[in-house]
């Protein structure tokens, strides 16, 4: 992938090519299928619909970190390395013009809290390199 092999890691939401931006989300689906969780996204989205969101507008970035935690919880897998490889844990201020214009600030605290949450679950790492999965 152009994103994974880029000389400098880019924040996933700032990847210009929408198809490259979607790859990690599809790889999570492929991984879920491989471990036998066929209804992963259906269950995840149902859960999200029934929970209060973590922010709107520029604060909606908090929903992405909730998504990361829930992926790990639903799959009972520590996917920290996967999300890190794809640039989900890049800190800084980012302008994203995708379905609207947003100015996100991703702080080290947000990343630390997400990683700490995942580590506290003691989930195993995936038995395969999820960044290499393709259909």
What does each model-found stretch correspond to?
Residues 29-42, 72-84:
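Structural helix-adjacent loops and short alpha-helical linkers that scaffold large soluble proteins
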Residues 59-135:
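Beta/coil-rich, acidic/histidine-enriched accessory regions frequently appended to metallopeptidases
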Residues 1-35, 42, 46-58:
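Acidic/His/Gly-enriched intrinsically disordered linker/tail segments
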């Amino acid at each position: 992938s152009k994103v994974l092999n880029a000389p400098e890691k880019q924040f996933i939401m700032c990847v210009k090519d929408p198809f490259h931006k979607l790859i990690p989300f599809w790889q999570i689906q492929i991984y879920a299928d491989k471990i036998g969780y066929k209804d992963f996204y259906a269950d995840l989205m149902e859960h999200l619909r029934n929970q209060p969101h973590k922010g709107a507008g520029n604060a909606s970035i908090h929903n992405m970190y909730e998504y990361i935690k829930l992926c790990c919880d639903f799959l009972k897998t520590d996917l920290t390395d996967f999300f890190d490889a794809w640039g989900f844990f890049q800190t800084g201020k980012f302008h994203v013009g995708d379905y609207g214009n947003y100015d996100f600030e991703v702080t080290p605290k947000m990343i630390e809290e997400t990683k700490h949450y995942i580590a506290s679950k003691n989930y195993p790492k995936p038995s395969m390199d999820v960044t290499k999965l393709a259909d």
